[in-house]
Amino acid sequence: MMGDNEGRRTPLLNLGVQVSMRVLTIGAAMASMWVMITNREVASVYGIAFEAKYSYSSAFRYLVYAQIAVCAATLFTLVWACLAVRRRGLVFALFFFDLLTTLTAISAFSAAFAEGYVGKYGNKQAGWLPICGYVHGYCSRVTISLAMSFASFILLFILTVLTASAARHY
């Protein structure tokens, strides 16, 4: 009798964890995207004004577009996870979508992080100077966006592991 109860509670508990983590992932990805999109600062260097915007960097644009894709895919898999509780055959497809979404999230984070690193520390060999001393607020908001992006990746990674574990049992 106890085994029957556990069998019924596990999918529901797993569904609760899945839904909670997917909602948190969507929130983190949307926050990352919003902070990056609204990030803009104008600075003056030696009397010359220049503007720092996310759209001037292909890596930051990629991060924004990837976060949009992460939100859409996670919303899709949120519905899919609810269906997978009733139809066990859908679990592998859920794992596959989670894996693709996780890979998208980490690739976008990595590209944007590399760009942010160069912006903060420069690259002496290439002759690129750090710019964060001039646009400190811009760099701080990029850091916040990257932290939220990394949080969405971690949540997706955990979801992928949980889904892979569930797929193994079915």
Swiss-Prot record:
Keywords: Cell membrane, Membrane, Transmembrane, Transmembrane helix. The chain crosses the membrane at residues 17-37, 63-83, 89-109, 142-162. Residues 38-62, 110-141 are extracellular. In flowers, expressed in the anther wall. The keyword Cell membrane applies. It is found in: Cell membrane. GO terms for cellular component: plasma membrane. NCBIfam families: A_tha_TIGR01569. This is CASP-like protein 1F1. Belongs to the Casparian strip membrane proteins (CASP) family. Residues 1-16, 84-88, 163-170 are cytoplasmic. It is a multi-pass membrane protein. InterPro entries: CASP/CASPL, CASP_dom, CASPL. Homodimer and heterodimers. Its main location: membrane. It comes from Arabidopsis thaliana.
